[in-house]
Amino acid sequence: MRLHELYPFDEERKQRKRVGRGSGSGWGCTSGKGNKGQNARSGGGVRPGFEGGQMPLQRRLPKRGFKNYLFKARYEVINLGQLVGAFEGKTEITLDDIYARGLARAGAAVKVLGNGECNVAVKVEAHKFSASAVEKIQKAGGEAKALEG
């Protein structure tokens, strides 16, 4: 017998509650919904935040600040060790190479972070670099070329 073959006995399984099946069941008549009203009807109930027609709290409170997330620059981050490991033996790594290897989604802005080691002189193209990544690339004799956009 295997773990996926185990199952509880029929009498141990809890039956689902079937409402509206006679008063003897304890859930007959109004089926636990109370008497009349919007909540007793099929599809009844109000949407979250609805306060019965009075001005809801969300609209009574003033707006504050601004929403910067609409204009925030989003970068796909790649660590330096990951980048150098994926392109061993290559001296120049372009954005197209990064996209082709699947390290970032095609067309996405790429930022290279300095986690990992860079032992070979390599020329790397990306939209942004962290200070530690630039330092490690230059220390190994390579070049970090930041692109615009």
Swiss-Prot record:
Residues 21-35, 42-52 have a biased composition (Gly residues). GO terms for molecular function: rRNA binding; structural constituent of ribosome. One of its GO terms (biological process) is translation. It comes from the Bacteria. Pfam families: Ribosomal_L27A. Residues 14-57 are annotated as: Disordered. Gene3D superfamilies: 3.100.10.10. One of its GO terms (cellular component) is cytosolic large ribosomal subunit. Keywords: Ribonucleoprotein, Ribosomal protein, RNA-binding, rRNA-binding. Signal peptide: none annotated. Belongs to the universal ribosomal protein uL15 family. Binds to the 23S rRNA. Part of the 50S ribosomal subunit. This is Large ribosomal subunit protein uL15. It comes from Oleidesulfovibrio alaskensis (strain ATCC BAA-1058 / DSM 17464 / G20). The gene is rplO.
